[in-house]
């Protein structure tokens, strides 16, 4: 995504990887454009069918999950998005499909495991073993889940902090729907928690105390928080970066990993406690 100036106006511009993705994004925006209050930034028409264009938001910035207000407002926005299934028949919208979160995570686990020798350049054997242990054990628990199916709705697909944009009018809106798909809302609340927990020292009790809206999340799915998703994804991304970019990213990722692994035993214990409540 980049800033583009045309005839004295500034725009957000992003080129979708495929025309089909751009068309999916436009379809989603047409549907969500009917919602009030607005959950999105409207699209600006473009002659290039692969371009996604929106008005530039002066002074805008992404959410910061270290801030309580941003956690609360981003969850509120996600809930509003998921609740649109009450007005929009998302399963009839072309270009939207479901996928298995468990299968995706199993594949990620296997990819990490297959590259453990390369990862030894950056992580100790013990750290790699820990990540694989938590990953393997959590996947076993997820496979045993006995949670009833819930309503299928639209999921944003990438709930990283910068896709929640504080706009010029002071409202928080969702951007970048490239990875949007169909699924159960609980699956996306889990992914949102994966993103938020590092910002609160993995304090699950704190998050649930400040956000009673999370009661809608089926406790039987909390085992999914035991899966070290952020670590697996970020390392698989980092290992293929060009050297200069890799060195910069590792300055963040190595301490992030060491810190996460110190919290994981307590997080595991807290999750078990919450599931039994």
Where are these regions (language model features)?
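Active-site acidic catalytic loop and adjacent metal/ATP-binding pocket
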Residues: 1-8, 139-187
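A cross-family kinase active-site recognition segment
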Residues: 68-126
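Long, hydrophobic, amphipathic alpha-helical segments used as structural scaffolds
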Residues: 85-93, 142, 146, 239-243
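An alpha-helical support segment within catalytic cores of ATP-dependent transferases
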Residues: 108-156, 263-277
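ATP-binding pocket architecture of kinase catalytic cores
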Residues: 6-90
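Conserved aromatic-histidine-acidic binding/catalytic patches
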Residues: 17, 66-69, 151, 219, ...
């Amino acid at each position: 995504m980049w800033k583009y100036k045309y005839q004295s106006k500034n725009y957000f511009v992003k080129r979708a990887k495929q025309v089909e993705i751009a068309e999916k994004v436009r379809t989603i925006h047409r549907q969500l454009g009917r919602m009030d209050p607005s959950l999105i930034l409207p699209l600006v028409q473009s002659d290039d069918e692969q371009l996604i264009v929106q008005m530039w938001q002066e002074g805008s910035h992404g959410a910061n999950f270290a801030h309580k207000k941003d956690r609360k407002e981003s969850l509120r926005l996600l809930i509003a998005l998921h609740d649109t299934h009450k007005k929009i028949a998302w399963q009839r919208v072309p270009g939207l499909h479901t996928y298995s979160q468990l299968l995706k995570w199993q594949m990620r686990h296997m990819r990490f495991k297959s590259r453990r020798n390369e990862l030894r350049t950056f992580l100790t054997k013990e750290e790699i073993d820990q990540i694989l242990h938590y990953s393997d054990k959590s996947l076993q628990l997820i496979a045993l889940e006995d949670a009833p199916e819930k309503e299928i709705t639209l999921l944003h697909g990438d709930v990283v902090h910068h896709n929640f944009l504080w706009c010029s009018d002071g409202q928080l809106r969702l951007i970048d729907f490239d990875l949007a798909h169909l699924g159960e809302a609980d699956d996306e609340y889990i992914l949102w928690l994966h993103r938020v927990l590092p910002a609160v020292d993995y304090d699950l009790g704190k998050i649930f105390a400040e956000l009673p809206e999370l009661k809608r999340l089926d406790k039987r799915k909390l085992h999914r928080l035991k899966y070290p998703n952020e670590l697996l994804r970020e390392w698989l991304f980092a290992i293929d970066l060009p050297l200069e970019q890799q060195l910069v990213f590792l300055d963040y990722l190595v301490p992030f990993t060491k810190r996460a692994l110190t919290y994981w035993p307590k997080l595991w214990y807290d999750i078990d406690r919450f599931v039994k409540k």
